[in-house]
């Protein structure tokens, strides 16, 4: 959005961890992670434990719109760079603080990582086959989601025109990603079972294997689509499946019919029929 972003890296000769993480571009030996994280940013090195480093950070903050930090709660305060000192330099500064579990609470001082949030939020417990273990996502999902939450919250704070502290954490970001499920668990005691690629309120929905060993994804969250799929798989005349509740109650039979239909055709044939 046109922001001039200055990334502060630690003064240890290594810098940001993504500079050495994962795949490297063979053309310049720079990691793809760093190209993603560091793109469109200016970078500087500051030793925030030194007087010079703290002074330089305060100078930057004096003319900045936003400061984003992801230290454990209390770290900036111990460095004498907390909101009090920063707002003395710039009362309009938006300070966005990203942690594992928030600035307060019993887990505030714990280190936070994406995997912890994915497990503790219950997200991993929702994923996997009914007879299998919980599954973690194969990407840094929490990190990406929390970054979006932090960016949105920061923009809202900027729009207010008032200097303030924005408190964002990994765990709450994952909880809000899960829609009504946390509320259903808290208010109703609902414990969603693992359904593979399925979801509790829409049937059929999942991935199915074709005759040529490809996978196709099918979802029927709207009634017209559900009726069309049922007609294709031979269940269009079944009155018991005319409602979402009826299909959910008869999930196994509907899934078996869809699996059989898809398994007897190639991926191209299935897609052709579904887009007719």
Give the role of each language-model region.
Residues 30, 199-204:
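Short amphipathic beta-strand starts and helix->beta connectors
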Residues 47, 69, 167-171, 218-220:
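Active-site-adjacent beta-strand anchor residues
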Residues 147-165, 176-188, 228-237:
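Oxidoreductase and adenylate-handling cofactor-binding alpha/beta cores
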């Amino acid at each position: 959005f046109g922001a001039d972003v200055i990334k502060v890296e630690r003064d240890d000769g290594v810098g940001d961890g993504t500079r050495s993480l994962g795949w490297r571009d063979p053309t310049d030996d720079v990691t793809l992670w760093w190209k993603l994280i560091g793109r469109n940013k200016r970078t500087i090195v500051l030793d925030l434990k030194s007087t010079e480093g703290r002074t330089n950070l305060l100078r930057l903050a004096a003319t900045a719109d936003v400061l984003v930090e992801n230290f454990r709660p209390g770290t900036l305060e111990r460095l004498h760079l907390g909101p009090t000192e920063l707002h003395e330099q710039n009362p309009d500064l938006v300070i966005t603080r990203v942690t594992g579990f928030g600035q307060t609470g019993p887990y505030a001082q714990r280190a936070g990582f994406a995997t912890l949030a994915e497990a503790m939020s219950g997200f991993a417990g929702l994923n996997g086959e009914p007879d299998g273990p919980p599954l973690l996502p194969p990407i840094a999902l929490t990190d990406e989601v929390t970054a979006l939450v932090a960016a949105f919250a920061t923009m809202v704070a900027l729009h207010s025109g008032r200097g303030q502290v924005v408190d964002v954490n990994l765990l709450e970001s994952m909880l809000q990603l899960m829609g009504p499920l946390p509320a259903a668990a808290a208010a109703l005691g609902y414990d969603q079972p693992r359904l593979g690629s399925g979801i509790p309120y829409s049937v059929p929905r999942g991935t199915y294997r074709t005759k040529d060993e490809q996978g196709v994804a099918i979802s029927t969250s709207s009634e017209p689509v559900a009726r069309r799929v049922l007609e294709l798989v031979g269940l269009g005349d079944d009155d018991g499946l005319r409602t979402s509740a009826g299909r959910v109650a008869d999930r196994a039979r509907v899934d078996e019919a869809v699996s059989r239909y898809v398994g007897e055709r190639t991926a191209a044939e299935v897609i052709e029929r579904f887009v007719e």
